[in-house]
UniProtKB/Swiss-Prot annotation:
GO terms for cellular component: endomembrane system; endoplasmic reticulum membrane; intracellular membrane-bounded organelle; membrane. The keyword Transport applies. Residues 87-105 have a biased composition (Polar residues). This is Cytochrome b5.
Length: 134
């Protein structure tokens, strides 16, 4: 949808579309008509109908949708929220994992923690059970 074609809707207009025959969602100030997607939604149609006509941004992000799901949303976008009713909540991005950092930290923890535990156990045993010969 190009910017000159973008329709705008109010929250009140979106709220009218809250049934399984007419299901609109507001996500990140964008309006999506997901009626045709209800039966295809991997999480079931109930979760979409429950959010129909409402701002579903938080619930959408809490689920942690994949990049494929985010790309798929584009075809259901029918417009945007009017400027005066938009929220300034920044879109959460997918977490970026640094495998290099995790691997380095994990390898240190994987041998350091058991080493310290063995040392503590050895000292405990020697102190309490080894005892000094008298």
């Amino acid at each position: 949808m190009s910017s000159e074609e973008t329709k705008t809707f109010t929250r009140a207009e979106v709220a009218k579309h809250n049934t399984n025959k007419d299901t609109w969602l507001l996500i990140h100030n964008n309006i999506y008509d997901v009626t045709a997607f209800l039966n295809e939604h991997p999480g079931g149609e109930e979760v979409l109908i429950e959010q129909a006509g409402k701002d579903a941004t938080e619930n959408f992000e809490d689920v942690g949708h994949s990049n494929d799901a985010r790309d798929m949303m584009k075809k259901y976008k029918i417009g945007e929220l009017v400027e005066s009713e938009r929220t300034s909540v920044a879109q959460k991005s997918e977490p970026t994992w640094s495998t290099e950092q995790q691997t380095e930290e994990s390898s240190v923890k994987s041998w350091l923690v058991p080493l310290v535990l063995c040392l503590v156990a050895t000292l405990f045993y020697k102190f309490f059970f080894g005892g000094a010969k008298q």
